[in-house]
């Protein structure tokens, strides 16, 4: 399977499982799980050929571990990044490291300096434990700025943190006072 096919399939799965399952007639439960057979069938009706083998390659080979298969391998979900209001992952609050990072583009800094980090259309703000991960994320949007987040101080003031299955840290928002541009 070519790298391009796997990458295109990953983008398609992200779109469908995080944002628009109805685009192919897929139903997700409140935890974001969708039936793989229904996914394959819905994709085919919309001109995209998927197979279990290809889906498993994408799930297992994705370096960011964006997707998970159910124990019986009959269902799939995105592990975070949802904008679909019907999906409400039941995540447990977790003690974050003292400092977390967020990568963004310089063009977003005026808004961040005014409003802090907000989830936009997603359910949570995404943070990482490693600067390199934050840099890789931020570079997708232009000239990168790494933001250091004082997670320890946020938690002390009552903010809640969660960690997705793939290690991404999540929180509802990050107010300006907890952000330092590096």
UniProtKB/Swiss-Prot annotation:
Keyword Iron-sulfur attributed: no
Regions that span the bilayer: none
Gene Ontology MF terms: NAD+ poly-ADP-ribosyltransferase activity; tRNA 2'-phosphotransferase activity
Any single Pfam family the record assigns to this protein: PTS_2-RNA
One record GO biological process: tRNA splicing, via endonucleolytic cleavage and ligation
EC code: 2.7.1.-
UniProt keyword terms in alphabetical order: NAD, Transferase
Family listed: Belongs to the KptA/TPT1 family.
HAMAP family: KptA
Reported function: Removes the 2'-phosphate from RNA via an intermediate in which the phosphate is ADP-ribosylated by NAD followed by a presumed transesterification to release the RNA and generate ADP-ribose 1''-2''-cyclic phosphate (APPR>P). May function as an ADP-ribosylase.
Protein known as: Probable RNA 2'-phosphotransferase
Organism: Pseudomonas fluorescens (strain ATCC BAA-477 / NRRL B-23932 / Pf-5)
């Amino acid at each position: 399977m070519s790298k391009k096919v796997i990458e295109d399939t990953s983008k398609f799965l992200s779109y469908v499982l995080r944002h628009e399952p109805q685009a192919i007639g897929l139903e997700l439960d409140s935890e974001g799980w969708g039936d793989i057979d229904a996914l394959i069938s819905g994709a085919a009706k919309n001109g995209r050929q998927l197979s279990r083998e290809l889906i498993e390659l994408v799930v297992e080979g994705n370096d960011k571990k964006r997707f998970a298969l159910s124990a019986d391998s009959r269902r799939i979900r995105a592990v975070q990044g949802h904008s679909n209001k019907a999906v409400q992952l039941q995540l447990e609050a977790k003690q974050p490291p003292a400092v977390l990072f967020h990568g963004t583009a310089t063009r977003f800094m005026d808004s961040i300096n005014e409003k802090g980090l907000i989830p936009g259309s997603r359910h949570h703000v995404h943070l990482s434990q490693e600067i390199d991960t934050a840099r890789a994320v931020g570079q997708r949007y232009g000239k990168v700025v790494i933001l250091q987040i004082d997670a320890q101080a946020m938690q002390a003031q009552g903010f809640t943190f969660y960690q997705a299955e793939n290690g991404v840290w999540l929180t509802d928002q990050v107010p300006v006072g907890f952000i330092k541009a590096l």
